Amino acid sequence: MNLDALMAIFTGFDVAAFLPELDTLIGWVEMVLRILVMAGPLLMLGFGLLYLLAPPKEANYSVGWRFWWSMASLDAWQFTHRWTGYVWSGLGLLLTLIMAFVCNAFRRMDPMQMVWAAVKSLGWELGLMGIACIAINVAVIIVFDKDGYRRKDYAEYEEE
C-alpha cells in the first residue's frame, strides 16, 4: 500500500471541523445533528464490545439478546451473544468511521443540506442495524432448533 495514496484519503479531513461554532444557531443545530448521527454507531460499538467481553452469564428476561431460540439453552445464549458482539462491534466501528467523515463534512454544507445528510445517515444506520438484527436471529435459527439443541450439521463436538 502506497503511503501517498493513504495520505490522499485524509487530505480534506479537518479535525477542527468537529468543533461546531456554538455562538450561532446554525452551530447549535450542527452540534445536535452530529450527536444524533454519531450516537447510534457508538452505542452499537459499545454494546458489541460489551457482548464480546462481558456477555450475560445466563438467559434472563432483563439483560441480553432476548429471542426465543437464544433463550432456549445456555449454548444458544452464548452463541447468540458472541455473534451479536462480533456483528455489532464490527458494524459499529465501520459506521463510526463513515459517520465521522459525514460529520466532518457538515461544516461545508448549507443548513438544509446538513439536515438532509443527517436524515440520510440515520436512515442508513437504522437500516443496517435492522439487517444485522435479522441476520443474527436467522443465524441462531439455522444453528439451533426451537428447544436450544444444535442441529446435526452444526454440532461442535462429534461423539465417537
Which ranges hold each PLM region?
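Membrane-water interface of transmembrane alpha-helices
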Residues: 45-64, 137-146
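Short membrane-interface loop/juxtamembrane segments of multi-pass integral membrane proteins
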Residues: 66-83, 156-160
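Select subsegments of transmembrane alpha-helices in polytopic membrane proteins
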Residues: 81-95
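Short, intrinsically disordered, charge-rich cytosolic tails of integral membrane proteins
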Residues: 146-160
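Hydrophobic alpha-helical transmembrane segments
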Residues: 27-42, 61-76, 117
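Long, highly hydrophobic alpha-helical transmembrane signal-anchor segments
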Residues: 2-39, 111-126
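Hydrophobic core of alpha-helical transmembrane segments in multi-pass integral membrane proteins
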Residues: 38-49, 95-100, 125-139
